[in-house]
Design a protein with these regions (language model features):
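Topology signature of small-to-medium multi-pass alpha-helical membrane proteins
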Residues: 1-181
């Protein structure tokens, strides 16, 4: 349970962030199970990549769970760590990485045959579902570099929320001042 000294507005923000991470993580686990069920051949490398995806989505669920309880402070710190691997995604000479546990707003620069045109492209991608892509030595030689603006914003948001909650906690514990509601 979130402590009573936290203002209603900040409790709501903690709860929304917590549920966002839980729902995104659960959706990611379900998508990963679905992809796994469609995979015809599973080598040790593919199994390792699936384990990595499950671990990342499970971590998102864990962060969300912490935010909904008394360990919200640890949940905020871990939530920042959860957002970091969601910032940058890339594809380059057969190697690719992309991960997001929820929505994404990405600025993307791409070049190659896998793009809309075969030249240099710049675009904005919006996604509402969790996504992961890990490629090792694939035949796709296109180039793509994306930055997830939502992940960057969430890191900023979480950091500001953490500062505000720390201020409320200090006011409550040391000065005995009740927070503004």
């Amino acid at each position: 349970m979130i402590p009573d000294f936290i203002s209603k507005q900040r409790k709501t923000r903690l709860e929304l962030l917590g549920w966002y991470q839980i729902v995104g993580g659960i959706a990611g686990v379900l998508v990963t199970f679905w992809i796994l069920s469609k995979t015809e051949q599973i080598t040790w490398v593919i199994a390792l990549l699936f384990l990595l995806a499950f671990a990342l989505y499970s971590f998102s669920i864990y962060c969300g769970k912490l935010l909904l309880g008394a360990q919200y402070s640890r949940g905020l710190s871990l939530s920042i760590l959860n957002q970091v691997p969601q910032i940058v995604s890339f594809a380059f000479i057969g190697y690719a990485y992309q991960y997001n546990a929820g929505a994404a707003v990405e600025l993307a620069l791409s070049y190659g045959s896998g793009t809309v045109s075969s030249g240099l492209n710049f675009g904005v991608d919006f996604g509402m579902m969790p996504k992961w892509l890990f490629s090792i030595a694939s035949d796709d030689l296109s180039f793509k570099l994306s930055v997830n603006l939502l992940a960057i914003y969430l890191i900023y948001f979480i950091d500001k929320l953490r500062e505000a909650l720390l201020h409320e906690k200090v006011n409550h514990e040391i000065a005995g001042i009740e927070p503004e509601i």
